[in-house]
Amino acid sequence: MKAIEWRNNRLIILDQTLLPLEEKYLELNDYHAVAEAIKTLRIRGAPSIGVAAAYGIALGALSIETRYCSEFLPLYQQISAEIASTRPTAKNLFMAVERMDHVVASGTDVLQVKISLVDEALKIHREEEEASRKISTFGADLIQPGWTVLTHCNAGPLATAGYGTALGVIIAAHQQNKGISAFATETRPLLQGARLTALELKEAGVPFKLITDSMAGHFMKKGVINAVVVGADRIARNGDTANKIGTYSLAVLALAHGIPFYVAAPSSTFDKSIESGNDIVIEERKPEEITYLRGQRIAPENIDVANPAFDVTPANLIAAFITENGIIRRGE
């Protein structure tokens, strides 16, 4: 399965909302469709969102029918703003938008700017692929033979437009014949762990167990989990980390049981512009994601629902960050 591909000036994505029941690829021909795909999680995972955002902007720019910079620029700004507004938490999205904006700001010829935007999007994609490969290699060195590693949500190839970050670490350790196994949390409310991580672990041949989110503490107490590895959507300058809701709970549980808690993420996820997790905007998603399951209501009508998509794990709970540049341990 390939999450995202640029082909003949069209963006091809795998609709992740349908997995694992249906493998369906969508051809996105305009930036509005890309924006909608990001909002509705057809493409998801911070690195993949960044790549999709870059391609979406390139698609939009290619559709602008003018050769005059004075006419091109305001139309481009509308495109960039719409893509940037899709999801507020993932740093990779804003990194991609900033890089594409810089290409436009540096250009003087509309045709050349369009070519350069496509080139920049392809470059961002290549960089994310290479980063996840290196993260997987560095992270595998932390995993000891025979360990069982717990992961949360989905940070594999589907989420990263490459090899995977947290899940890439687990898969790489397995491929090194370390005899490891995994626990995957189902990840309510949208079940990315059950639908996507379980699928990727199965395809990679990694022995694993799927568990509900609330079972993690039980298995930590039993002593069968040796490490936790998760991905990230945004990391503040002090190391506070935003990731899928439930990550903070796992970090607290890991600390209570003396289990190392690792965050695997590319440098594009680190946000040096914010001091701490208090500055990270947490996306609030629609209540129907909790009150409905596969189109069927599972909760009473007319009730209040809170549905934050992410939480923030304080840096002091994180043993180390696994990046494409190596391991950054707590306090470094």
UniProtKB/Swiss-Prot annotation:
GO biological process: L-methionine salvage from methylthioadenosine
Pfam families: IF-2B
Keyword Amino-acid biosynthesis: yes
Catalytic activity: 5-(methylsulfanyl)-alpha-D-ribose 1-phosphate = 5-(methylsulfanyl)-D-ribulose 1-phosphate
Active site, per annotation: D233 (proton donor)
Transition state stabilizer (site feature) positions: C153
The protein's annotated pathway: Amino-acid biosynthesis; L-methionine biosynthesis via salvage pathway; L-methionine from S-methyl-5-thio-alpha-D-ribose 1-phosphate: step 1/6
InterPro entries xref list: IF-2B-related, IF-M1Pi, IF_2B-like_C, Initiation_fac_2B_a/b/d, M1Pi_N, NagB/RpiA_transferase-like
Chain sites annotated for binding substrate: R44, G45, A46, R87, Q192, N243, K244
Gene that this sequence comes from: mtnA
Family: Belongs to the eIF-2B alpha/beta/delta subunits family. MtnA subfamily.
GO molecular function per UniProt: S-methyl-5-thioribose-1-phosphate isomerase activity
Job description of the protein: Catalyzes the interconversion of methylthioribose-1-phosphate (MTR-1-P) into methylthioribulose-1-phosphate (MTRu-1-P).
Entry keyword Amino-acid biosynthesis: yes
Coiled-coil zones: none
Enzyme Commission no: 5.3.1.23
Record's protein name: Methylthioribose-1-phosphate isomerase
